[in-house]
Amino acid sequence: FDFGIFFSGSALRSILINGLDPFLEGNRIPNKNVLKFIADNHWSVDNPNPNAEYPRLGLTTGDIGNNTVNSTYWLRNGSFLRLKNLEIGYKIPYGRIYVSGANLLRFSPFDLWDPELSSWNSYPLQRTVNVGLQLNF
């Protein structure tokens, strides 16, 4: 029987999320297609919640000018711990049987996207599982 495990992670790390659509365009283009979690949790005249998770959306460039200003408001805890690789094997008389996996688990308080990626529109890391048989001749 054999076993291998590898964790990777990052601590004391912040993620600046002000490049998030629909705020990416700043003063140039008003908000058009809005991510659902922003549309559901933004400040508006109809919902003047001072603790709204996201700032005002707008249809004119004057409405959204301050949304991309760098601020600690946009900082989020980007710490994470990932089970990067796991392999379990069993030796048989003429070889070995094994199961291995990559990117199986992630623990993080940041839930908008994978904190190991550079931004919200990066391709996600693939989760893979392999089952194998090694034979010795």
Stretches with model-predicted labels:
Residues 12-95:
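Extracytoplasmic gating/loop element in the C-terminal half of outer-membrane beta-barrel translocons
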Residues 7-13, 85, 101-108, 137:
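Transmembrane beta-strands of outer-membrane beta-barrel pores
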Residues 1-5, 95-99, 131:
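Transmembrane beta-strands of outer-membrane beta-barrel proteins
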Residues 89-93, 100, 134-136:
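Structural signature of outer-membrane beta-barrel channels/translocons
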Residues 1, 10, 92-95, 126:
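Outer-membrane beta-barrel channels and translocator barrels
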Residues 95-105, 125:
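Short, surface-exposed polybasic-and-hydrophobic patches located at secondary-structure transitions
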Residues 41-51, 68, 106-137:
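C-terminal beta-signal and terminal closure region of outer-membrane beta-barrel proteins
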Residues 1, 83-88, 127-131:
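Hydrophobic, lipid-facing positions within transmembrane beta-strands of outer-membrane proteins
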